[in-house]
A protein has these predicted regions:
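Conserved AAA+ ATPase small/helical "lid" subdomain
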Residues: 164-213
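AAA+ P-loop NTPase catalytic core and its hallmark functional loops
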Residues: 1-180
Length: 213
């Protein structure tokens, strides 16, 4: 993942809820030490304002006020996390198509052919997370054209042993008994969630890391 990011490839981390997709991106961020911008596309209600910006008037003059996304994609070697892209509004997907296309790499400010275009700076890397699996329900299926603009990294929910190994690697100074307890409880909630309909939330890998830290 780090080598792909260094080459400017777009990465999509896919997997069921709780498997540590966002945390994996954060680890890549720490390793690369690049300017970072986080966007939760799953909670975005107004894609045009969030991704492009707004037209505003002042003393009879109309001007364009760019979004923070527009500003960040003009900074070389920035990393942009498009979190929960699978839950995003389809309009957000359409806006991002040219941004993520390696042969285009621009953001069109308006639908008009003559509208201004904002070029994506060199070295900008886009990462995204997408939920899949039986625990993910949505009326939307992620656009195939958008998905093809990413290199897909498939992730699975960690088992108890793998989670314990991860925690001991991240927290070598924490007592192993504590880390073992966290990994065991997390694994048990995930197992129970598969067979018990009353359990609708699991302890995610991110939450395990937070408890350990």
């Amino acid at each position: 993942a780090i080598r792909s990011a260094l080459r400017g490839k777009n990465l999509m981390f896919t997997g069921p809820s709780g498997c540590g997709k966002t945390m994996a991106v954060m680890e890549v961020r720490k390793a690369l030490k690049r300017p970072f911008h986080y966007m939760n596309l799953g909670s975005t209600q107004d894609p045009r304002t969030t991704l492009i910006g707004t037209r505003e008037a002042d003393d009879g003059t109309t001007y364009f006020k760019p979004s923070s996304f527009v500003n960040v994609i003009q900074n070389e070697n920035s990393m942009v996390l498009l979190d929960e892209i699978s839950r995003a509004h389809p309009e957000a997907w359409n806006i991002l198509l040219t941004v993520l296309d390696p042969k285009q790499r621009y953001l069109q400010v308006d639908e008009a052919m003559e509208a201004d275009k904002v070029s994506v700076a060199d070295g900008v890397c886009f990462m995204s997370t997408a939920n899949i699996g039986t625990d993910y329900t949505s009326a939307r299926t992620i656009d195939r054209a958008l998905e093809e603009r990413f290199t897909i990294i498939e992730m699975e929910v960690l088992g108890r042993d793998d989670e314990f190994d991860l925690l001991t690697t991240l927290f070598p100074n924490v007592e192993e008994e504590k880390l073992d307890t966290i990994a065991t409880i997390a694994a048990e909630t995930r197992r129970e969630a598969k067979i018990e309909s009353k359990i609708n939330r699991i302890i995610s890998t991110r939450q395990s890391v937070q408890m350990a830290g």
